[in-house]
Amino acid sequence: MAGHEVQYGKHRTRRSFSRIKEVLDLPNLIEIQTDSFKDFLDTGLKEVFEDVLPISNFTDTMELEFVGYELKEPKYTLEEARAHDAHYSAPIFVTFRLINKETGEIKTQEVFFGDFPLMTEMGTFIINGAERIIVSQLVRSPGVYFNDKVDKNGKIGYGSTVIPNRGAWLELETDSKDIAYTRIDRTRKIPFTTLVRALGFSGDDEIIDIFGDSELVRNTIEKDIHKNPNDSRTDEALKEIYERLRPGEPKTADSSRSLLIARFFDARRYDLAAVGRYKINKKLNVKTRLLNQVIAENLVDPETGEILVEAGTEMTRSVIDSIADYLDGDLNKIVYTPNEYAVLTEPVVLQKFKVMAPNDPDRTVTVIGNASPDDKVRHLTPADILAEMSYFLNLAEGLGKVDDIDHLGNRRIRAVGELLANQFRIGLARMERNVRERMSVQDNEVLTPQQIINIRPVTAAIKEFFGSSQLSQFMDQHNPLSELSHKRRLSALGPGGLTRDRAGYEVRDVHYTHYGRMCPIETPEGPNIGLINNLSSYGHLNKYGFIQTPYRKVDRETGKVTNEIEWLTADEEDEFTVAQANSKLNEDGSFAEEIVMGRHQGNNQEFPASSVEYMDVSPKQVVAVATACIPFLENDDSNRALMGANMQRQAVPLIDPKAPFVGTGMEYQAAHDSGAAIIAQHNGKVVYSDADKIEVRREDGSLDVYHVTKFRRSNSGTAYNQRTLVRVGDSVEKGDFIADGPSMEKGEMALGQNPVVAYMTWEGYNFEDAVIMSERLVKDDVYTSVHLEEFESETRDTKLGPEEITREIPNVGEDALKDLDEMGIIRIGAEVKEGDILVGKVTPKGEKDLSAEERLLHAIFGDKSREVRDTSLRVPHGGDGVVCDVKIFTRANGDELQSGVNMLVRVYIAQKRKIKVGDKMAGRHGNKGVVSRIVPVEDMPYLPDGTPVDIMLNPLGVPSRMNIGQVMELHLGMAARNLGIHIATPVFDGATSDDLWETVKEAGMDSDAKTVLYDGRTGEPFDNRVSVGVMYMIKLHHMVDDKLHARSVGPYSTITQQPLGGKAQFGGQRFGEMEVWALEAYGASNVLQEILTYKSDDVTGRLKAYEAITKGKPIPKPGVPESFRVLVKELQSLGLDMRVLDKDDKEVDLRDLDEGEDDDVMHVDDLEKAREKQALEAAEFANSDEK
């Protein structure tokens, strides 16, 4: 027997074909959401308050300080928030301290700071009763970036940009004349030496001393001449910079100093964030820049006088490691003191080394480091600017390397917590201005924190973010896998990110650093391809928001692969050689072969085993969760795998789902972490279990009660239904499944069913990927799903009086009211069809002025005789089903309703949808198709033992699409069915073709895994042997019931007067330009005329036609289409004298055309005839006169 048994949870065992030992369990798959939000509550929120506060007034006599905050108990529980359309949120109270600096008086007060939405355990938020998700954003990391560009003459130039988290950009660039310029905040460029002089290093010799002598520096100094001898060089430079930043304003050196300080050196206006400081220190650090360069001077320890490194030594990694203390310490730092006119006069600390120029060994190049300022320095320093300029100048000398902006070392993730913190900061900054004004205006003696704080800007910012941000999305709740994928989604779009139109090919492409971090396969098809990605299965964020992936460490001394795990970011991984997870190992953990396949800086090649430093943890670390659920992924073309991964997320939860016979072992983990199942929180014993609740007695004696959700409507209109798995007396452990969620079976993801599938044609019905299906799948409810639709009706106060929900509806027979209760609301359990009343409602009609008698009748008999019209809620087209729930909200019950609404009734209707012709089906390999025919069981082809086939697929769908995985799954699935087992074949480590044939043989199948099939209609065998097996097939959310649509009389667009489009608007089918040509080609002029008039925008004509049809009269001639009037007006707007004439040659106003009963507009030919007739009549008249 090939393979080995693996237990998944308590309810399922699978035979696994994996050969690679798993050394690391998958992390919790939604930790990217939950951990980030927890960090935000623990530290992020506090940091935001500390960033913005304290706030002082303009005279600096009062100060408002932040003390702390506290989240109180949520107003509603999760279920209540869902039921009441409310937020699941907790009130937040912040303690402030107001200090009067003149009197020394201190007032401390707790201020209510609004309700803050809380994250549920599943990583979602409940906003207005619906589950939403905040998608993590993939953005460029703050830091310093260097790039090169080739001009039209083939000359290479260099550029550099410092990108902050917020604040002005600082750019450097070279031009074709080899002069280096700088730009501040995207303004006009100035020679870079101007900025150096403004920093207080004004002499030409001083600049050459700092940066070393190079052609670029000399050329730039020549360009940067001293124009005004009355100013010092620094003052002149400051004025020049001011003129660029504020053109047209009077320039002074002082105003320029304060402007530059505000732009770059003020922590409140310029923020690199922790990640920006880390990236800058890493890039400008001398250790990485000296690596593999030849040092041009002796490195001497100033304390002992010992020569650490002699001139001419190549600085290999081992040499640098040996003098790491010297390079990191203060011994090699040089202090430069700016002149007294500088922007900042504090001394500037740098590190400075001379190395041989790589391009010219006779010259030396100066390398300047920024001496790594502390992590807490979140703004730029003069040392950063000088070190950046040094790196930039070094690039022209062949030293250093340019950055790849698509490298995941340069892109980071902003998860929920950070996005919320940014939003909160925006709100607090708006509040700050408000507070400052109130502090200054009001009387200091009586002020309290409560009086000067207005929380509206903060609550508005949070509300806006959750309600309308591009990253706050309605949760994709088709099935647990789609929930999980949505929570792990990474979007490059959104505020501060890319836009679809601007994103080029490079950003969307797969990059070698995606390995183990972002899935190369799961991304949408269409305009968002490559911009929306998914986190790989083992991906994890570090504190800076870079994605890390785990590797097994290789012991360099013994050469053995250890079980020690290290998490590496993309730029850390670049320094190492990593072996693949499927490299063969000996028992002791050493590599079995001298040469192993590995990766180094994006090169996949063979490496000597001795040079390998890390090894992949698992073969599935490359791909995302949905992709890891595709068996035999390694045998599928990547384009089809992409469709397979995406279509699994569109699977509809079935009534009785089955886990796949051929799985990947990922189904258990995906179901466990999705949040759709009920998982035991503690060890214990089940003491009560039914369909509504499960009670577990813990070991310490306390009782856990779990509520089972039955038939709740999900975001996508499917039934969210949980099924109890445990019985009284079962013992459960923490983390066990105690109830399955939707699309789960025995604690495993179960998106579809395991039908018997044959690859064969049948009467041409599976042309173009269509699917032929047996009626058994309809009768036995194999692919039946339950869908819930929500309808609501509300009563409002109108000008004529309040609307009323009642059973007494005018002109409606008793038969239509049979299922309504005494209030006029449908009973639960009623079967309803299109047009049935769900909620009886009447609205007052406008009343004419009543006579005295009528007023008397009203006074005697009350309001009953008043005129009302029927505005009941009825079942729309395609909405038939069973009423499964009714919710009533009224003011009297304390429900919060919109203003003007007195009562709100919600009715939920459940539909059981069997599979039918036109529904879309798919396998897991991107093999999708539409059901074209449902064949009676007796007509389906059958196997030699009499089993009829369930589904027939077209064999032509396989070769050109290169998704051979489906054929392997088919054979292995049949073997699993015959053996009565479930199989796991993990991605990139699954069943080989030998394993497959061995299992087929064990199952007693033929050696080619094909079989003879018999035609169900004739009983004759088919000519050739057919591949028949079991394939996992899912029913997708694109169902024909939702798409079928017909229009009679419907709404028209106000402007064009043409019917609207689309099912949602009850629109028509567009009859476009090409369709008009088709009818013209057939000469079907009358059909075409009515399509372009009555059925489109002939406003009067269509009314008359409707009237004629209803009264049984002949349909009158069509009138003038609205579009003709538009055409006339457009021609007139071009200055053409366009008029419409009647038969008497009189001009007709287009508006009058529809007034008369008979149209006066004539055809051109008729006009000619009329003129001739007129001429004849005139001649006759003249003759008669003469007579």
Swiss-Prot record:
MF terms (GO), sorted A to Z = DNA binding; DNA-directed RNA polymerase activity; ribonucleoside binding
Name the PROSITE patterns for this protein.
RNA_POL_BETA
GO cellular component annotations, sorted alphabetically? Answer: DNA-directed RNA polymerase complex
In the record, biological process GO terms are:
DNA-templated transcription
Query: What domain of life?
Result: Bacteria
Alphabetically list the UniProt keywords.
DNA-directed RNA polymerase, Nucleotidyltransferase, Transcription, Transferase
Which Pfam families does the record match to this protein?
A: RNA_pol_Rpb2_1 (PF04563), RNA_pol_Rpb2_2 (PF04561), RNA_pol_Rpb2_3 (PF04565), RNA_pol_Rpb2_45 (PF10385), RNA_pol_Rpb2_6 (PF00562), RNA_pol_Rpb2_7 (PF04560)
EC assignment: 2.7.7.6
Q: Which reaction does it catalyse?
A: RNA(n) + a ribonucleoside 5'-triphosphate = RNA(n+1) + diphosphate
Among InterPro entries, the record links this protein to: DNA-dir_RNA_pol_bsu_external_1, DNA-dir_RNA_pol_su2, DNA-dir_RNAP_su2_dom, DNA-dir_RNAP_su2_hyb_sf, RNA_pol_bsu_bac, RNA_pol_bsu_CS, RNA_pol_bsu_protrusion, RNA_pol_Rpb2_2
Q: What does this protein do?
A: DNA-dependent RNA polymerase catalyzes the transcription of DNA into RNA using the four ribonucleoside triphosphates as substrates.
NCBIfam families of this UniProt entry? PRK00405.1, rpoB
Q: Which PANTHER family match?
A: DNA-DIRECTED RNA POLYMERASE I SUBUNIT 2
Q: How does it assemble?
A: The RNAP catalytic core consists of 2 alpha, 1 beta, 1 beta' and 1 omega subunit. When a sigma factor is associated with the core the holoenzyme is formed, which can initiate transcription.
> What protein family is recorded?
Belongs to the RNA polymerase beta chain family.
- Protein name (Swiss-Prot/TrEMBL): DNA-directed RNA polymerase subunit beta
Organism this protein belongs to: Streptococcus mutans serotype c (strain ATCC 700610 / UA159)
